[in-house]
Amino acid sequence: MMVIRPVERSDVSALMQLASKTGGGLTSLPANEATLSVRIERAIKTWQGELPKSEQGYVFVLEDSETGTVAGICAIEVAVGLNDPWYNYRVGTLVHASKELNVYNALPTLFLSNDHTGSSELCTLFLDPKWRKEGNGYLLSKSRFMFMAAFRDKFNDKVVAEMRGVIDEHGYSPFWQSLGKRFFSMDFSRADFLCGTGQKAFIAELMPKHPIYTHFLSQEAQDVIGQVHPQTAPARAVLEKEGFRYRNYIDIFDGGPTLECDIDRVRAIRKSRLVEVAEGQPAQGDFPACLVANENYHHFRVVLVRTDPATERLILTAAQLDALKCHAGDRVRLVRLCAEEKTA
């Protein structure tokens, strides 16, 4: 059974294996054991209530409960940009016009922005390619909404997600090549590694401070603004179906889109509800997949179950109860895994 649980110190080697499979561009999952150990420690201290909000971050792993194999990772930053500035570009427009010359030009322009400061962030989503089946990707991504719904007071009103931009298998980023490299004088992979290992001071020191006309970039770079890496397209679609939208903010490194949503408008958060759980043999039927989570802050668990999402009393097997660390009579959080398709 696949189970979402909080990260543990013993997971560091498994996270290193996952990091080696990302192909670069996933800034928050560098293949650096010291950095990953620090990240795990920060998550543990967050759960223990030892950190200020500006430093809090939760990390979860997807585990096969039968073998102990860690198949994926996902995380939530509680409030970005309160310690180190959180940069992105806002894609806007500058108009240059002259009535005398009968000239009017509306030029797409990149403006350096800290507009998402204080927002909660969904980040570090990665599923081992071998495990991209049977709803594991949906479980991994959406489990965070169950945690946010259960512990709403831990998070701010807006949640954002930076989507991985267009990078090829050799680590070549058209957006970086045309823009970032001119200011940072280093390859994308080097900048990505520095950022991922917490060495972010160079961003503030070297970032262009003035608006940038996108027409000055290569056509290849212009074409990838707000576009996602092919492997990230499914993750973008998942978030958009939950209510997230692209509001013209992009990543400063690879030009990938930043999606955002008011937390209370996220479908899985808004529609999740508490039901009583009982032990038994679940009813047979053509039921949809549903997320089921306990309400235990320190021992949080999420699993996928096929059941009636409208049920008032959820019947689970002993194995499912054990995976959720629940007992009969406890209340669990339940929501349909995917939004119902609207019919004409």
From Swiss-Prot:
Domain of life of the organism in this record? Bacteria
User: For this protein, what reaction is catalysed?
Assistant: succinyl-CoA + L-arginine = N(2)-succinyl-L-arginine + CoA + H(+)
Which residues of this UniProt protein bind succinyl-CoA?
L125
Q: Which residues form the signal peptide?
A: none
Q: Catalytic positions?
A: H229
Alphabetized Gene3D superfamilies for the sequence: 2.40.40.20
What this protein is called in its record is: Arginine N-succinyltransferase
Species source reads Escherichia coli O6:H1 (strain CFT073 / ATCC 700928 / UPEC)
Q: Which gene encodes it?
A: astA
